[in-house]
Amino acid sequence: MMQVLLVTICLAVFPYQGSSIILESGNVNDYEVVYPQKVTALPKGAVQQAEQKYEDAMQYEFEVNGQPVVLHLEKNKDLFSEDYSETHYSPDGKEITTNPPIEDHCYYHGRIQNDAHSTASISACNGLKGHFKLRGETYLIEPLKIPDSEAHAVYKYENIEKEDDAPKMCGVTQTNWESDEPIKEASQLVATSDQQRYYDHFRYIKYFIVVDHRMVEKYNGNLRTIRRRIYQLVNILNEIYLPWNIRAPLVGIEFWNQRDLINVTSSAPYTLDLFGKWRASDLLNRKIHDYTHLLTAIVFVEQILGMAHIATMCHSELSVGLVQDYMPSEHVVAAIMVHEMGHNLGISHDEKYCNCGADSCIMYPQISIPPPVYFSNCSWEQYQNFLTIYKPDCTLIRPSRTDIVSPPVCGNDILEQGEECDCGSPEKCQDPCCDAASCKLHSWIECEFGECCDQCRFKPAGTECRGIRSECDLPEYCTGQSVDCPIDHFHRNGKPCLNNNGAEKGEFQHTGGRY
C-alpha cells in the first residue's frame, strides 16, 4: 500500500521579509518564509519501508498570502530508465562509466488541491526546492541557507531581479519543414481511429544529456551539483510534456570534465552540426537513446539560448539540440530544453494568433519571465502532423521500468513492471491489442503500433506505407511480415528531378531552429 506523508508547514513572518536576499535563483527582492514541520501519518494497515528514504506520495499543507493550500506530490517514476548511466573522464582521457542507484530518488510532480489548473515540480532531496502553480500564479520555494534552520523562502518569478534586460531569443530564422504542402494536406484530414490511437499513445523519448567543459567549470567541477541540477531540469521537462502523453526518461549523462570532445563555439549552428555528427559516430555506439541535448555554459552570439533541428526526432545525427545554462533558475533553463525538443518534434515558433491560455507559450521565439509551461493550439496541430508524416516510431519503444518499490496495479493506465500493457479499466480500454483484465497482450496479436500495423496485425504486403514526398523520392510498401516500413528509397544519383537538378543523397534537408 502506498505511503502518504503529511507535512504541515507553518507560515511565519521572517524579520527580514520584504528585503533583498541572494538565493539560488538570484537576487530576490520580496519573499515569505515558511518552516516545514514534518508530521508522518500512515494509513491504517500501511507498513513503513525502512529501506525507502523518499516516500512515493507526499502531501504538504501551508499558506500562501494568508490562504491555506494543500500540495499533493507523487514521485516521478518515469524520471530514469532502468539502464541509466553516467560517464566522465580520467585525467588521461580514459572513459569511466557507472550505473548509479536511482530507484529511491527525491523528485516529484504534484498539484494543488481544488485547483484543476495547478502544477508542481519539487525536489525533496535537501528540503523543498522547486515551483508550484497556484490560482494562475507561479511560486518558487527553496531552503534558506541558515545554519540549523528549517526556513524556506517562497517567492514569485517577478521578484527575481533581472541581470540583463536584453531579449533572449530562439535564434530560428525559418522553422518550416522542407515543404508545407504535406503539412497542409495532413491538417485537412480527419484522423482515423487507428491514427487517433497512434496520436494518443504514450511516447517515450529516451533522453541523454551531455555537459560541456565550460559548464563543468562553471560549477567548479562539482559533478554532484550538476547532476542534481540536471535531474530537476528533466523533472520539470517531464511535467510540461506529460499532458501530451510524452515522457522523457533520462537514460544517461556524460560529463566532459577534462575537455570538450567537439569544438564548442559561440556559433550555435556550427556547434550543433558538430555535436550531431559526434552523436551519430560516437555516442550512439555506446548508448542507445532517442534524443540528446548538449548543455553548455558558453554564450552564443545574437542572444541565442538554444538551437535544434526541425522534425528530426529519431534521426541518428539530427535528433539533437543545444541549450545554454542561462540562468540559476532551473525552470527557465528547463523551458529552453522543452522548446528545443519541441522543434525536433516538428513544432515551429508560435505566430501571434496561436493561443495556450497564458501570456506566453512554450514555442514563443523569446523566453519570458515567468517561463511558459503550456504549448499552444498551433504546437499541438504541428506535433500531430509530424506524427502523421514522419512517424517517429522510436518513441513508441518503452524503456525498462525503474519502479521496483511499489507492486504493479493492473488497470491504472500506467505500464509497470510485470505488465505487457495497461490500457485502464475494461470499461475504458481502447487498445484492441491489450487484455484489460490481465494487462497482457492478446495471444493472437502480431504487432501493436507501427507504419505497417493495423488493428494489431501486419498490414497486407503491398500496402503503401510511405508516399512520394519529392520528385527524387520513391514510394515504399509494407512486406506483410513486419511493422516497419522499408528504408526510404530514392531515384539513383544523376536521375533528373527537383527541376532537373540531379538527385543527390536522397535526404530531406531539415532547417535548423534556434530558441
UniProtKB/Swiss-Prot annotation:
It comes from the Eukaryota. Zn(2+) binds at residues 339, 343, 349. Residues 407-493 form the Disintegrin domain. Residues 1-20 form the signal peptide. Residues 21-193 form a propeptide. CDD domains: ZnMc_adamalysin_II_like. One of its GO terms (biological process) is proteolysis. The keyword Nucleotide-binding does not apply. The active site is at residue 340. Belongs to the venom metalloproteinase (M12B) family. P-II subfamily. Snake venom zinc metalloprotease that possesses hemorrhagic activity and degrades alpha chain of fibrinogen (FGA). May inhibit alpha-2/beta-1 integrin (ITGA2/ITGB1). Monomer. The disintegrin domain belongs to the long disintegrin subfamily. This is Zinc metalloproteinase-disintegrin BA-5A.
